[in-house]
């Protein structure tokens, strides 16, 4: 049966995803940035509250995946923290300036991660040669690759996803970006063994008082009176489809 990983931006969301049938949690902060490293406090709370495997993302900032020496040093420290807290895996990725997997840095990441299962995230979708990257990451010992098939959504990238799955079992190809109940059968039919979904929606803030004209965001149009949360019904429906597909 295919594995359902749900991207969560809080411990409360992780609890809801677990309750509704997720198999694994990717734990992140900052949904507007596509996911950044969660705080130490969130990580500790997740270890205490969640029984499912939780894989925190290690990503120091938004934007591209070519990092300064200081940023990369921080990543290694965060990886050691994730390992020391007892998580079974983590999600990360680095590229060089030419869009290739940064092999020297990935070797340091793998050494810092030790026994943890490492997922190479959607930095893969920005690399120059995905086929070579798949081979390189397999040689490095990366467990899985999260990918949209180098397209804006995994549905649009299904051709490359299918090709990479056919190339071999290692690293595992996990389809993600726009995966939901409505298109889940497409991925199951293609032989995808792991799918990744945010399965989420935006909820309004509980703030009754709102100060107009003052923003904490660099984007003056950002709506700061809402938060992203897992939609438990969406998770449950995806799990139902996966379970029925097995039979």
From Swiss-Prot:
Main location group: cytoplasm
Subcellular location: Cytoplasm
Signal peptide range in chain numbering: none
GO cellular component, one term: cytoplasm
Keywords linked to the UniProt accession: Cytoplasm
Family recorded in the similarity comment: Belongs to the CutC family.
Name of the featured protein: PF03932 family protein CutC
Protein species of origin: Klebsiella pneumoniae subsp. pneumoniae (strain ATCC 700721 / MGH 78578)
């Amino acid at each position: 049966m295919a594995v359902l990983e749900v991207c969560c931006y809080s411990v409360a969301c992780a609890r809801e995803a677990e309750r509704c049938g997720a198999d694994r949690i990717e734990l992140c902060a900052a949904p507007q940035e596509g996911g950044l490293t969660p705080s130490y406090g969130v990580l500790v709370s997740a270890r205490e509250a969640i029984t499912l495997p939780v894989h925190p993302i290690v990503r120091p900032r938004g934007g591209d995946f070519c990092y300064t020496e200081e940023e990369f040093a921080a990543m290694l420290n965060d990886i050691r923290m994730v390992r020391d807290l007892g998580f079974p895996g983590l999600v990360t990725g680095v590229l060089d300036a030419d869009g290739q997997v940064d092999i020297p840095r990935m070797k340091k990441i793998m050494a810092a991660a030790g026994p943890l299962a490492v997922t190479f995230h959607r930095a893969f979708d920005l690399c120059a040669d995905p086929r070579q990257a798949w081979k390189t990451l397999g040689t490095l010992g990366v467990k899985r690759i999260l990918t949209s098939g180098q397209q804006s959504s995994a549905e649009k990238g299904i051709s490359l996803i299918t090709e990479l799955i056919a190339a071999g079992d290692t690293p595992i190809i996990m389809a993600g970006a726009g995966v939901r109940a409505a298109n889940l059968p497409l991925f199951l039919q293609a032989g995808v063994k792991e799918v990744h979904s945010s399965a989420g929606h935006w909820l309004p803030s509980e703030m009754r008082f709102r100060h107009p004209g003052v923003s904490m965001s660099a984007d003056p149009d950002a709506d700061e009176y809402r938060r992203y949360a897992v939609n438990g019904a969406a998770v449950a429906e995806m799990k139902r489809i996966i379970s029925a597909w097995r039979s």
